[in-house]
UniProtKB/Swiss-Prot annotation:
Lineage start: Viruses, Duplodnaviria, Heunggongvirae, Uroviricota, Caudoviricetes
Protein name: Gene 86 protein
Organism field: Mycobacterium phage D29 (Mycobacteriophage D29)
């Protein structure tokens, strides 16, 4: 789970528009920088190192982007995993 999970309250101007804040934040478990999730977002990535998190701050696997089954309908999940890791 996320370390130091917190909610940053919205700062509004005189007309009621949000000018800052209104997001959840936590410390990235990989690099220690702040990861932010704004209202309406689902999965987010750390802007510093690219570590993936779900909406509640749980760290997700971030090697899925290299799996061809994520974008190629002709490649199955297991076949894509094998292709992704074939150079090890």
């Amino acid at each position: 789970m996320a370390n130091n999970y917190r909610y940053v309250e919205a700062v509004r101007d005189a007309e009621g528009f949000i000018i800052d804040g209104d997001y959840a934040a936590w410390d990235c478990s990989r690099c220690g920088h702040e990861a932010q999730r704004y209202r309406g977002q689902s999965d987010v990535d750390c802007r510093n190192c690219g570590a993936c998190y779900n909406a509640s701050g749980q760290r997700l696997r971030d090697d899925w982007r290299g799996n061809p089954s994520a974008w190629d309908d002709e490649v199955g999940d297991l076949e894509g995993f094998e292709l992704q890791h074939s150079d090890y």
